[in-house]
Amino acid sequence: MSIKTPLQISHPLEFYEDKYRKAVAPEWDLRILNNVFDSVVESDIENMYENIFSEIWIDNFKKSYEFSKANFKRVQLYLTTPILYFSAELTWLFSAQVVPNDEIISDKFWKKIFAFPEMVLSSKRSKPFMKLQNIIFDENLLDNYRKYLFWDDDLFYKVYDIETIGHEFGHTLWLDIDTQSIMNSKTWVFKNIEEFKATTGWLVAYFMGKNDDDLLSESVIRDHVIRTIWLLSYKKVNEIEPYYCEALIHLSILNESWIISLDNNKISLNFSNYDNLKRI
């Protein structure tokens, strides 16, 4: 955790290989800095956190507020590209990670966020267009998503910063030092709500920010909708159940806001209901 050079070494990462002990597979790699853009999402996340705590009175939750804020301020962000890696299963590489996922260790050694924007963009572009996508989503939604994905690197990186890096920053907040251990000692449901919390963090931060770029907002929500539907595929994968739980909650919110609808048995995006989503 103390290494701050352009070459970064990962630790065993958060891949849910053992559903009983919540153990992780051995995943090691060497990463090199690749700053393809300047991340700006950190300030939005911090402003959201401060504003919400000011509304609910910081003094009522002072210990939790100060612990999370201290963790947040000590996060190191690295935009990188993996150059060497060893893994038990190459099934989740790479989107982004915040490490370590233990608050006691983090209290001593801080946290790092690793992001892989260029690799993620390249990976998404290399995937074939699937018939299943055309069965699930309407043509207009897919066409606009593919234009954004293939024709506008800068827009993609802005969305990646807001969603993916914002998600990882969201993991560092709304925690006390023993939150995870207490929840898991009783029900093992910490991760089942933690992924939803992290995604909701960047959503609320974006909604509370001064964002008047409709193209960016529509791209952000479209990507969020597609990701939510995709996460439903984890229904029967017990090791990564938290992402399915997250998807169910977000799908309920998307439906309630009417920002998505089912037209001719296909999901369409109704961006005109964006304000409904923000209110909910």
Functional labels for PLM-detected ranges:
Residues 140-146, 177-182, 225-230, 257-260:
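Short acidic (Asp/Glu) and glycine-rich catalytic loops that position anionic groups and cofactors
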